[in-house]
Structures are given as structure tokens and as C-alpha cells.
């Protein structure tokens, strides 16, 4: 239950946790529609569908609520979308943030396979991962009338080739 985070309070009355990350929606490929999309399992969808009761109390206490996006063993992956694919998927994620009043998106690319071709896909690279972060942040800024975050956990397939990644001026190794 994400509401458990409210129970951890510092001596000054502030919440102990800065953010709760809902784990996880999936980046998936729909072969019949030829489209990358976010798929929520029943547990995540239940949290989203009950946002007013389960997520908004966190936000009212100053705790950010993010939806993590995880690869799901198919060709759609955080670091493998084309520039156009990054823009399209970033817009979808921003719309989800608006619809469910979320504070942002987290990316975790542990389970993508990276074998896609076509207009949605590019070879996996740190540049394409950064592009997806950028396009998502840009779309959230355009749609959401509140501050939004992009969180990066792991870049899976390309992680070992990266000396470090800079996100909002902070180095991550």
C-alpha cells in the first residue's frame, strides 16, 4: 500500500520519503497496431484507477508519486526508440501523468530485448535513452500544470558501456 509512506515522519513534521515510485508499468510493443505503448498490470492499474484514494493523499503531504516504466522482454525498450518513437511514447507517458495526477515517470530498462525495426525503433544507445527522458520531460511540462520529475534507475542493455550519465546536471554511475 503506497499510503504506508505517509506514516514515516521526521521530527520536524516533514515526510521522510521524497517520492513513491509505483513499480511498474511496462513499455510494450503491440505488433497488431504497430505501436509502442504503456501496459499496466492489474495491480498497477488498480493504483492508477484509485488515484484519488491511494495516490493523491501522498501528494497532499508533499510526497511525489512517480510511475516506473520497465522493459517487458520484447523489442520496445527505454534505450531503443527512434527520435520519433521517443516523442510519441513521451507524450503517452505525459498524458498518463495528467490523467492520474502523477508527478513523473521513472525508467528501468532491465528486461528489454532490443530487436525491433521500423519507425518506432533505433539501435539501443545512451543517446536514445537520454532522448526518451528529454521527450518525456518536455511533454510533461507542456501537459501537466505542476512540477514533474524524470527518474532513471537502470539502463540495462547499454549500462555496461556507459562511464556515467548526467541527468539534470547530476552524474550517475
Predicted regions and their residues:
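Chitinase-like catalytic core of GlcNAc-active glycosidases
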Residues: 1-173
